[in-house]
Regions:
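Bacterial N-terminal signal peptides
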Residues: 17-32
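N-terminal alpha-helical interaction modules that lie
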Residues: 37-261, 270, 282-284, 301-313, ...
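Residue register of alpha-helical TPR repeats
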Residues: 90, 124, 159, 164, ...
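Alpha-helical adaptor scaffolds
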Residues: 222-226, 231, 238, 256-268, ...
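Short active-site neighborhood of thiol/selenol oxidoreductases, capturing the structured segment around
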Residues: 671-700
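Structural microenvironment flanking redox-active thiols in thiol-disulfide oxidoreductases
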Residues: 694-734, 746-750
Length: 802
């Protein structure tokens, strides 16, 4: 533990002045340094310059990629002439456009930033950054403003048309001085957006008229014609847009605009995009989303095996890229959505074990408060939902009960989701005959219901009191009790639920309770309770069909199963349930007929799954083999499909942390190997002169002992030299539990990629490294990660996983 004397404001000012004077001296002695990085130098000399870790070029550059781009294999060979002064800048522009076509916006922006680093005056590079931020208008505005500024020199007329068209599309910032505009005029905003979109379409047509050989303009116009519906500009003819795309494919049959044709026909006529579905992935095999998109078409056409192949290909390409570039999974566009849809398709085709494995894998991925928690549409939420779905729809009650004590379906702070899980746990306990434990779980749900009902009564009393007070004169001053009541909301971390919210919660819980009571009635053969509770439980139709058959309502169950087969054709589960119920009813000929269909549908299914294993007598009766599945006949419309293992690994794996060595305040070398064999948190901070960094240390230091109790070491590495580190410690006024180390030459920052390659400056970083030296969690940003409690909880979760 380090204890130091108080750090006075005067000392802080002197340190800041010393640093500024040192910088001025360095710049005076080395004019070339100033010339090489004018924005950086100007910002550092300006007292109003950016905080440590922030971009020298403005706030728009803070978010997004900060590490250098490389030329990636598997990008479509785009031709897009620009004013680039170097071949490298031109290559990165063309790579960026290929990535735009694949909606790979993070990497597209990285490519365009690399082009700008190669050629700082290249206006079209900032146009590309704008295009890569189509869904982030504040950042897009900053980039297009820069492009407009640079377009005045060394820019061709064609490039200028691209830039000016996009400038008119991106909304200008509103005037904050208008105090009278209390509420935005939504209708006026919609109309303005529509007009800007119509003007952009007109501008792109003008560009095409002047440069008719510009294939990329055709592709981007086709995309915008499809996107324009979101801005109120309707597509009057999809076939006209399709014809425009046809001109692109005439010039380049493997153009990545196959992606746009899939979007064009996805919801309208998916069969019109089968050819593009076959060519989309091979047109840009290094972009995961290009493998994902054909899955839309195949899913709509109920070709679930083909869709699952596409989604697995997408996942593998993403996994390979993440491991190669050290990104965390949910930083990747569309990653979680692709994988959760893959689980749904695996359920459809009966690949139950793969569905379970992938769901658990999604849950196991690193959580982050910005993009992967229960409240975000990330891997954790999707994984939990799909794991429960797979277990319940395939009636894997024993496995579901095992999860109650496992690492994947742990208790959650979200009441409604915890109740959903407890409800299914009670169902599983009843279905497996553990009536005692099931009743205990049911009572816990009933207690929750009583608490909610009491809350409703309290809120109704509160509303009545408020209504009564409104009728009274307000001449009487508020008493102390009323003042205390008014202060209560400030003491709460989140607002109390409203009466309507609590009532909706009760409705959801009542549905869960009805589901549990229905399961209890099935096992007790209590038909009266079953008939009363079943409609309230809103069960999945196939679960309901099986429960009805078990309680004796076989005919009703068969009707539900027949409807499910009709509504969900080409899916394994409806057919399996129908065959089972028909066989139990004695309708063996009908069962055999549907079984013959199931043999083809279940060509990739897990036959050891209980739902399918119970059909062995039917298979024997029709003379089928033990493995009664029939192979899927080869299709001629799938295009060239590479072996899946060539695209990447099936699962994301954490990467190996770099080796490192830093100096302690006494100048001794501390090697990273000293932490081998035990988990550790490494914090990269930007010195005592960085106020945000000190705030981070403030957050983590009080929890140092809690981390140690969890078996996790914590160490912080600074950009300061040993001398600067000691001076900071001397002037700092509080105890610091966390060992602080010096990395004055910043090579460790670069090794861990806590470095802005574009502006040559360090970034904030926080890492969890396990006992094997694998990086299990990370945050690299222009701001430090300050939620020490979240990371402690998440570290415990991740380290407990197998």
């Amino acid at each position: 533990m380090l204890k130091t004397s108080p750090f006075s404001p005067e000392a802080s000012l002197l340190m800041s002045l010393r640093n500024v004077l040192l910088l001025v001296a360095l710049l005076t002695r080395s004019p070339s340094l100033f010339a090489a990085e004018p924005a950086k130098a100007e910002a550092e000399l300006n007292s109003d310059g950016p905080a440590a870790g922030h971009s020298y070029h403005g706030e728009a550059f803070n978010e997004g990629p900060r590490q250098a781009a490389v030329l990636i294999e598997g990008m479509s060979p785009i031709k897009f002439e620009t004013s680039a002064k170097t071949p490298a800048a031109q290559k990165f522009i063309e790579q960026g456009i290929a990535q735009l076509h694949g909606f790979w916006y993070l990497e597209a922006e990285r490519s365009f930033r690399q082009a700008a680093k190669e050629d700082p005056e290249l206006a079209i590079a900032y146009w590309g950054m704008t295009m890569a931020n189509a869904n982030n208008t504040s950042r897009a505005r900053g980039f297009i403003d820069k492009a407009m500024e640079l377009r005045k020199t060394n820019t061709t007329r064609r490039e200028t048309l691209y830039i000016e068209a996009l400038d008119r599309l991106i909304p200008k910032p509103k005037n904050d001085d208008k105090k009278d505009d209390k509420k935005p005029d939504r209708e006026a905003e919609r109309e303005d957006k529509k007009k800007r979109t119509e003007r952009y379409l007109s501008d792109m047509e003008r560009l095409l008229h002047d440069f008719p050989d510009d294939i990329e303009a055709r592709a981007l116009l086709a995309l915008q014609l499809w996107l324009a519906e979101r801005s109120g500009v309707k597509i009057t003819s999809r076939y006209a847009v399709n014809a425009l795309l046809g001109e692109v494919f005439t010039a380049n049959p493997m153009h990545p605009a196959h992606h746009y044709r899939i979007h064009l026909w996805d919801s309208a006529r998916p069969d019109n995009a089968v050819q593009s579905a076959a060519m989309c992935g091979p047109s840009s095999p290094g972009i995961a989303h290009m493998w994902h998109m054909p899955g839309h078409i195949y899913s709509k056409l109920k070709r679930y095996n083909d869709a699952a192949w596409q989604q697995e290909a997408s996942a593998r390409v993403d996994h390979a890229h993440m491991i190669r570039t050290r990104l965390m999974p949910d930083q990747i566009h569309n990653f979680a959505h692709n994988n959760e849809w893959l689980v749904r398709n695996l359920i459809h085709v009966g690949r139950v074990q793969d569905a379970l494995d992938l769901s658990r894998n999604l849950i196991s991925l690193p959580q982050h408060p910005r993009y992967n928690t229960w409240n975000k549409r990330g891997s954790y939420k999707y994984g939990r939902q799909r794991l429960i779905q797979t277990l319940t729809e395939y009636a894997l009650w024993d496995e579901l009960i095992k999860e109650a004590g496992g690492n994947y379906l742990q208790p959650t702070e979200d009441d409604t989701q915890q109740e959903e899980w407890l409800g299914w746990l009670a169902v599983a306990q009843f279905m497996t005959g553990d009536t005692k434990q099931a009743s205990r779980t049911l009572r816990s749900l009933q207690r929750r219901s009583l608490v909610l009902q009491t809350t409703v009564l309290d809120l109704e009393d509160q509303q009545a009191d408020e209504a009564e007070n409104k009728d009274k004169t307000d001449e009487k001053p508020k008493d102390s009790d009323e003042s205390k009541t008014a202060e209560k909301p400030e003491e709460q971390e989140k607002p109390s639920p409203t009466l309507d919210e609590v009532k909706r919660h009760i409705t959801q819980l009542d549905q869960i309770l009805a589901r549990v009571r229905s399961a209890e009635a099935v096992k007790k053969k209590d038909l009266k309770v079953f008939n009363d509770q079943l409609p309230k439980g809103r069960l999945n139709p196939l679960i309901q069909a099986q429960w009805q058959a078990e309680i004796g309502q076989v005919d009703e169950g068969i009707k539900l199963a027949e409807k499910a087969v009709k509504d969900s054709s080409s899916q394994v589960r409806p057919l399996a349930v129908l065959v089972d119920l028909l066989w139990k009813k004695g309708n063996k000929d009908e069962a055999k007929k549907h079984f013959s269909t199931l043999q083809k549908t279940a060509n990739a299914a897990d036959l050891n799954t209980p739902m399918l294993a119970k059909l062995a007598p039917v298979a024997k009766a029709v003379g089928a083999k033990t493995d009664w599945r029939l192979p899927d006949p080869p299709k001629e419309d799938l295009g060239d499909r590479p072996p899946l293992n060539e695209l990447g690994p099936f699962r994301w794996q954490p990467y190996q942390a770099p080796t490192w060595g830093a100096k302690s305040p006494d100048g001794k070398l501390v090697a990273g190997e000293e932490f081998d064999g035990k988990p550790r948190i490494i914090i990269f901070y930007l010195g005592f002169g960085c106020l945000h960094c000190i705030e981070q240390i403030h957050k983590f230091s009080p929890l140092y002992d809690d981390y140690k109790k969890a078996g996790i070491d914590v160490v912080a590495i600074s950009t300061e030299t040993v001398e600067e580190l000691n001076e900071g410690l001397k002037n700092y006024g509080e105890a610091i539990n966390i060992p602080l180390l010096s990395n004055g030459d910043k090579h460790i920052f670069k090794q861990f990629r806590c470095w802005d390659d574009f502006e040559d400056q360090p970034l904030h970083g926080t890492f969890l490294i396990d006992h094997r030296g694998k990086v299990r969690w990370q945050d690299i940003s222009y701001e430090p990660f300050n939620d020490a409690e979240f990371l402690l909880k998440e570290s415990k979760r991740l380290l407990a996983l197998p």
